[in-house]
Protein backbone atom coordinates (compact mmCIF):
# COMPACT_ATOMS: atom_id res chain seq x y z
CA UNK A 1 0.00 0.00 0.00
CA UNK A 2 1.68 3.26 -1.10
CA UNK A 3 1.60 5.93 1.59
CA UNK A 4 2.21 9.53 0.52
CA UNK A 5 2.56 12.33 3.05
CA UNK A 6 2.42 15.93 1.79
CA UNK A 7 3.49 18.62 4.23
CA UNK A 8 2.45 22.22 3.55
CA UNK A 9 2.90 25.51 5.33
CA UNK A 10 -0.38 27.29 4.50
CA UNK A 11 -0.16 30.78 3.01
CA UNK A 12 -2.94 33.32 2.63
CA UNK A 13 -5.66 30.96 3.87
CA UNK A 14 -4.75 28.13 1.50
CA UNK A 15 -4.77 25.48 0.39
CA UNK A 16 -8.51 25.24 -0.01
CA UNK A 17 -10.36 21.95 0.37
CA UNK A 18 -10.75 21.88 -3.42
CA UNK A 19 -6.99 22.28 -3.89
CA UNK A 20 -6.35 19.49 -1.38
CA UNK A 21 -8.72 17.23 -3.31
CA UNK A 22 -6.84 18.06 -6.52
CA UNK A 23 -3.53 17.22 -4.83
CA UNK A 24 -4.88 13.87 -3.61
CA UNK A 25 -6.22 13.00 -7.07
CA UNK A 26 -3.10 14.18 -8.88
CA UNK A 27 -0.61 12.38 -6.65
CA UNK A 28 -2.69 9.20 -6.79
CA UNK A 29 -2.88 9.38 -10.60
CA UNK A 30 0.89 9.90 -10.76
CA UNK A 31 1.52 6.78 -8.63
CA UNK A 32 -0.71 4.78 -10.98
CA UNK A 33 1.03 6.15 -14.09
CA UNK A 34 4.65 5.99 -12.94
CA UNK A 35 4.70 3.03 -10.55
CA UNK A 36 1.68 1.09 -11.83
CA UNK A 37 0.07 1.07 -8.37
CA UNK A 38 -3.56 0.18 -7.68
CA UNK A 39 -5.32 3.51 -7.10
CA UNK A 40 -7.66 1.98 -4.51
CA UNK A 41 -4.67 1.13 -2.28
CA UNK A 42 -2.99 4.56 -2.34
CA UNK A 43 -3.11 6.58 0.88
CA UNK A 44 -2.47 10.34 0.72
CA UNK A 45 -2.24 12.45 3.87
CA UNK A 46 -1.86 16.24 3.80
CA UNK A 47 -0.32 17.76 6.91
CA UNK A 48 -0.59 21.52 7.33
CA UNK A 49 2.39 22.70 9.36
CA UNK A 50 2.05 25.97 11.27
CA UNK A 51 4.72 28.46 10.18
CA UNK A 52 5.92 28.69 13.81
CA UNK A 53 6.65 24.94 13.77
CA UNK A 54 8.90 24.96 10.70
CA UNK A 55 12.32 26.51 10.34
CA UNK A 56 14.74 27.33 7.57
CA UNK A 57 18.28 28.55 8.08
CA UNK A 58 17.85 28.75 11.84
CA UNK A 59 14.69 30.87 11.76
CA UNK A 60 11.02 29.96 11.88
CA UNK A 61 9.12 30.42 8.63
CA UNK A 62 6.77 32.73 10.54
CA UNK A 63 9.69 34.99 11.46
CA UNK A 64 11.09 34.90 7.90
CA UNK A 65 7.73 35.90 6.45
CA UNK A 66 7.46 38.84 8.86
CA UNK A 67 10.83 40.14 7.64
CA UNK A 68 9.68 40.26 4.01
Swiss-Prot record:
The active site is at 2 (proton acceptor). One of its GO terms (molecular function) is isomerase activity. Its EC number is 5.3.2.-. Keywords: Isomerase. InterPro entries: 4-OT, 4-OT-like_dom, Tautomerase/MIF_sf. Transmembrane segments: none annotated. Belongs to the 4-oxalocrotonate tautomerase family. This is Probable tautomerase HP_0924.
